[in-house]
Regions:
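Alpha-helical transmembrane segments of multi-pass small-molecule/ion transporters
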Residues: 1-314
Length: 314
């Protein structure tokens, strides 16, 4: 077994377990997350060409789907005759409305999907959330700042993390082709960085949940379940759309299912009941577990296919 395969098999879940068990010391390193993420994205973006980054019809479909799920889910839950219905509705709203994670292109690359389509969507989705997010939350929630302040926060929180490594990778591709070729040859770099980053993200999420001590146990359990159910719904819809449009289940599945929890939690804290952010924290844990399972399954399938091809040649 190669080191890369060993890390895919055991390193990912080991990283998740480490983040849960050692969340206190690791959460101190949370300021490193944006910089580690940008480094990981740089290696991923070195594998695509500038001409591949462009809007596509599927991007508009994804944005509309996201908004419909968010508003439909909110109003469906808001008027249920149960205690804390408004808090649950806010949690559902944000689990659907949350922008796509900047790390989505990395996972798509590890799973053999289209990095270009997801990278384009990360940028377009960020721009759409800058406009629609504050408007929707200002309508349904209780804003603590101006519309311009909210739009600026989302812009500063997401766009540089994607654009800096993207432009750096394209610049090196153009000016330093030999360096670019060397960077492209480091195909395992994104995996190694993701294993480290995953432990920090999980630790930061668990630390956040541990601090949220308000609310009864039943409410917390329901909020966690909301994170799980909305995660399943979005990955399922995304994968079904991806099979129909692209003939594979990875690309659109990650675009719709993998979320930027830090931005979502901030938006909840700014507009809605803060306890609703427990669902988004739970969503982050579930999506990372699912991503790890996908990478392991993809790696095992590749190994099996290689063995079959080897037998056929012999």
């Amino acid at each position: 077994m190669t080191i890369q395969r060993f890390l895919k098999e055991y390193g990912l879940f080991g990283s998740i377990l480490l983040g849960i068990v050692a969340y206190r010391p690791l959460s101190v390193l949370s300021p490193m997350i944006p910089y580690v993420l940008m480094t990981m994205l740089f290696f991923t973006f070195s594998r695509i060409a500038p001409r591949d980054i462009r809007p596509r019809p599927i991007h508009l479909t994804l944005i509309v789907t996201q908004i419909v799920l968010a508003l439909g889910g909110y109003f469906l839950v808001r008027y249920l005759p149960v205690p804390y219905a408004e808090i649950y509705a806010q949690a559902v709203l944000m689990c659907f409305l949350c922008p796509v994670a900047a790390a989505a292109p990395v996972i798509v690359g590890l799973l053999g999907g289209s990095i270009a389509i997801v990278t384009s969507y990360v940028v377009l989705n960020c721009l759409s959330i800058i406009i629609t997010g504050p408007l929707i939350l200002g309508w349904l929630g209780h804003p603590q700042g101006t519309l311009l302040e909210s739009m600026t926060h989302v812009l500063v929180g997401v766009l540089p993390i994607v654009m800096i490594p993207l432009l750096t990778a394209f610049g090196i591709r153009w000016k330093l082709p030999s360096v670019h070729a060397r960077v492209r040859s480091l195909s395992s770099a994104s995996l190694y960085i993701w294993i480290f980053l995953l432990s920090l993200v999980i630790a930061n999420t668990v630390h956040f949940v541990a601090k949220e001590r308000q609310g009864v146990a039943t409410m917390i359990i329901v909020l966690v379940l909301i994170g799980l159910v909305t995660c399943i719904i979005q990955y399922s819809i995304g994968k079904a759309m991806s099979r129909k449009v692209l003939g594979e289940s990875v690309t659109i599945g990650q675009a719709l299912g993998q979320k930027n929890s830090s931005i979502s939690i901030w938006m909840i804290q700014s507009y809605l009941n803060p306890i609703a952010s427990v669902s988004q924290a739970a969503y982050s844990i579930f999506q990372n577990i699912f991503n790890a399972l996908q990478v392991i399954h993809h790696d095992r399938r590749q190994v099996l296919e290689q063995r079959i091809r080897h037998k056929e040649r012999n």
